[in-house]
């Protein structure tokens, strides 16, 4: 074993500090004022070759490959004072103290709050199996969130978690570990200081986290990280807010890609349709027609791999980049028909090739595969339908060949979206199988997680190389840190059960906390018997808030999960999906916010209400953006839904029932009566929620003609509505529309609209729904001119411009033609003594 007991002098070298211990050299970088890198070089190999990082201050052998995604920065300013017993490195916001004997590293913020402390003796170790271990001090009231895609409760305190992604079909949503993703990042939230700090362990090797599950009398309470290979390479990310940690983590690993609008619509799917013996193309077109007949909006179809199940010497086998022409007679015509219907198709592509694949010999000649650990031949593993070999994406020439296969096999027919599936490389039992690793050489065991990221990068590049103005849309089941740069992901092949409905929420929230805003689960469950009627309705009612909303199944009872599968329930299904579409201006704006800031769309309660410790274990209720609290029903047969409304610490901030507009103070649990139609939601003070006033059935083709905005102006607030064409890259050249809304609350409430960008404002009508329970306005003005007042709702609805106070909703309804320029609405709630006049 190798253990760091004590350290000697600390020196500065170019852009890092070197700490020489009695076991290994440790290097420390102030990457930014808030991000510190601590790397213990057990192998003495300081070569940089990261696929994860989008921000660096050093050269890396992946710089050329990631040149469109990586930002080079200068290290932040810091000063070193080296003493006999302790060295202190001070930056502008963080202070590092290096205690020399016994050795440990501590990090403090500018207020003197301890953010991180190593455990002496245990901090930087290599065990007898060559695994590297880092151990950190924790407290009994610390909470831990993130870790990528994990099941169970959202708070992982006292949990042990493995990070070895695999094909976990039908997983137990409470207990199964690992799932499909490898994102070794978590957020520690202190229950005493309410401050957050992020830990990103920069590794692609299999690893595990012990978050205080074990205790030892000789040391302070601790957590530990253990990796099968590579250095201890920790990026410590200061907050103090959770949002700041996530924003800085996504500075480090990349912001979410801005997806086309279709990616946020209902994505139809099923293993059933592409597996029909013939005419699958017609069956899928009929499915789209049926959704329209049923009045259900739809934007996409996730095409399972049956389309490429072709005849081989061993029978029908799935072979990526081929087409079964009995099932899909003319792929080009079919893609064109789907596009005419406003449907984006995402064909399934896999990185493994069966030994009977018709292109196998061509791929072998191009030397595209992972090599056996001993033999000079591609490494073999179990695959769909037989033995397969696996593509090595860490080789530049392989990447170029792969893009050509994508173009020739899919994109030339009209494909603009790719579903990268089964890319965990789970069936490669030989973890010592060799990969190229940009010429450095490594093993598949150390680099499995990056393959999915690279696949998604390549599918995006192939689409834009074929047509530079198409906005790519990649879907992926697996993923490593940084997958958010490329793809929308989902929680794999979940089990159809009530627990999956409930615990998949925490899984999605955890992914958002891990920088992956575009996540979801298979609504209705993927594997198992078909969902019972109540479960299916509740799942859709919850699913419409997920960034990715897809109903997908491979039911074991030979059924197909579809919106109309229960005639007595389809009205509730339709209503829920239409709610999502009506809120698409809000959802797309949150998507844009994630693209710019890294912040999640679905936010856990404790992220928005970080000072209320009563929210710290909440993994079912969540905030959609900052304005809307969603408390879906996830228990079978529920008639009452208990909802905790957080303590905001501000008496002016309250919550309003979305439907009744009943008002509630924070810091209390309320009981909400529910039935099968219920989707409990609460509007938070300061809310600005843009919605479509007209019906939308397809996000790619239907415009928002009337913009309806819900507001709760108890406090000052702001929000940016974002819009563009939703399908091209023209937004990069200024063809977008930002509507910055700012609200100044008070007796005179001012609502200012400021516009930026050249994209056409499609909304012809503006309608404001301004909650104000106390009283109706004295008057309303638009740019200084009084707006007509109506006492009768019918007359208000018939007018082009006017205002009306709804006694039912206790809100001011203001309607006017959209000026399509900067303007201001003034609503006066001033005291007016009519009798005194």
Where are these regions (language model features)?
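Catalytic-domain carbohydrate-binding cleft regions of carbohydrate-active enzymes
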Residues: 1, 113-677
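N-terminal accessory segment at the very beginning of proteins
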Residues: 1-256, 261, 267-271, 278-284, ...
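Aromatic-residue hotspot detector
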Residues: 49-63, 323, 622, 675, ...
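Short alpha-helix boundary/capping motifs
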Residues: 366-367, 373-374, 684, 808-812
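Catalytic cores of secreted or luminal carbohydrate-active enzymes
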Residues: 578-597, 658-738
